Curated annotation (Swiss-Prot):
Pathway: Cofactor biosynthesis; coenzyme F0 biosynthesis. Belongs to the radical SAM superfamily. CofH family. This is 5-amino-6-(D-ribitylamino)uracil--L-tyrosine 4-hydroxyphenyl transferase. Keywords: 4Fe-4S, Iron, Iron-sulfur, Metal-binding, S-adenosyl-L-methionine, Transferase. The keyword Iron-sulfur applies. Gene3D superfamilies: Aldolase class I. It comes from Trichodesmium erythraeum (strain IMS101). Its EC number is 2.5.1.147. It is an enzyme of class 2 (transferase). InterPro entries: Aldolase_TIM, CofH/MnqC-like_C, CofH_family, F420, FO_synthase_su2, rSAM. PANTHER family: FO SYNTHASE (COFH), LIPOYL SYNTHASE 2. The keyword Metal-binding applies. Its cofactor is [4Fe-4S] cluster. It catalyses: 5-amino-6-(D-ribitylamino)uracil + L-tyrosine + S-adenosyl-L-methionine = 5-amino-5-(4-hydroxybenzyl)-6-(D-ribitylimino)-5,6-dihydrouracil + 2-iminoacetate + 5'-deoxyadenosine + L-methionine + H(+).
Length: 393
């Protein structure tokens, strides 16, 4: 394709997006094609090709049209209650075998102490996830253990929003106890879990999953569990682990599956939906060596992340309006830049974060509210605290 033809096609595609049309996967793939993506890692933000700048400006304009100029944030705390895990994902530096150096499993008093500390600092949300610990049972059953965690937290802090337990954890509990996904989700919901993290998605393409996380749930199971959550009234987030072995085509397939999932929830009038999309760039600093060698870089390539951020807004924005970068993975400066490439939310304070930090991420584990606010105002945008479901506080 000549440069002139590329520019014409890009202009047509971007104009369609600005007019409110959903782009096809083929159209969207052109935005990530090698012709528009000439070794971005070596370019400065001030010397981008015209094609990349056009994509960035389109994403920024769509963000403004779809959700406005206000940038939101949430005061929350991550609690990773155990890193003991039966699985061995090739990108994970977090998991440990029981009894090995670095393994941990918090008891309920430690979890409550962390929740109390979060409340004292103004948190409205606890995000709680952990490894798949086969010993995490009550009377030989997994679900009662998880329900006990939820009830103890809710008994002490009834106002806290519990954003807890990924689709992978739901499948693990269901498998261990021989019950359905619906049974597990309904029980967690009734105990006080208000929403489900859309993690463990990685890339929703089984060819990728067989290499990077062969023990994890497959694409169909992830989609089934998230769709079941929506049907049962439990909102979810959505994520993509990017920048490792996946191709642009597989990235677009992932986005297409998320869009279709959200369309189903809306068309069937389910009581819950996907609330946000978060791009999670691969961090390989401390990841297992085989994948590090295959990927060829230990930290995210910022411009690659920004381009995919923009393309995600362009492809998903009609259906999933809230887009968030990961300051843990790309740093606060990178997250601030992402607010110009289609993101409207800067995420949360977290207060602690183990999974990405143990992989070697540069962003740290805690962000003061004032730092988030200053990052937003430095762009000439207004900030607004929100809750987990994007209600202004």
């Amino acid at each position: 394709m000549t440069n002139q033809n590329l520019e014409t096609n890009l202009e047509t595609i971007l104009n369609r997006a600005l007019q409110g049309y959903d782009l096809s996967p083929a159209e969207t793939l052109l935005l990530l094609s090698p012709t528009t993506k000439p070794n971005l890692g070596k370019l400065a933000l001030t010397e981008l090709p015209a094609e990349i700048t056009a994509i960035q400006k389109t994403a920024d304009q769509l963000r403004q049209q779809q959700v406005g100029d206000t940038v939101t944030y949430v005061i929350n705390r991550n609690i990773n209650f155990t890193n003991i895990c039966e699985q061995h994902c090739s990108f994970c530096a977090f998991r440990r075998d029981d009894g090995k150096t670095g393994a941990f499993w918090l008891d309920i008093n430690q979890i409550l102490a962390k929740a109390n500390d979060a409340v004292q600092r103004g948190a409205t949300e606890i995000c709680m996830q952990g490894g798949l610990n086969l010993q995490a049972k009550v009377a030989g059953k997994s679900l009662p253990y998880y329900l006990q965690l939820v009830r103890e937290i809710k008994n002490e802090f009834s106002h806290l929003h519990l954003h807890a337990f990924s689709p992978q954890e739901v499948q693990f509990i269901a498998r261990e106890d021989g019950v359905s996904y619906e049974y597990v989700i309904a029980a967690l919901r009734d105990a006080g879990v208000h929403s489900m993290p859309g993690t463990a998605a990685e890339v929703l393409d089984d060819a990728v999953r067989r290499i990077i996380c062969p023990e994890k749930i497959d694409t169909g199971t992830w989609l089934e569990i998230v769709g079941t959550a929506h049907r049962l009234g439990m909102p979810t987030t959505s994520t993509m682990l990017c920048g490792h072995i996946e191709t642009p085509k597989q990235q677009i397939l992932h986005l297409e599956r998320l869009r279709s999932l959200q369309q189903t929830a809306i068309e069937k009038d389910y009581p819950a939906r996907i609330t946000e999309f978060i791009l999670l760039p691969f961090v390989g600093q401390e990841a297992p060596a085989p994948l590090r060698r295959r990927v060829g870089h230990d930290q995210p390539i910022l411009l690659d992340v920004l381009l995919l951020t923009a393309v995600s807004r362009i492809f998903l924005g009609n259906w999933i309006i809230n887009h968030q970068p990961s300051w843990v993975k790309i740093g606060l400066d990178g997250a601030k830049e992402a607010l110009k490439w289609g993101c409207n939310d800067i995420g949360g304070t977290l207060m602690e974060e183990h999974i990405t930090t143990m992989a070697g991420a540069i962003g740290g584990t805690f962000m003061e509210v004032k730092n988030l606010q200053e990052a937003i105002t430095s762009l000439g945008r207004n900030y607004q605290q929100r809750d987990t479901l994007y209600k202004y506080l």
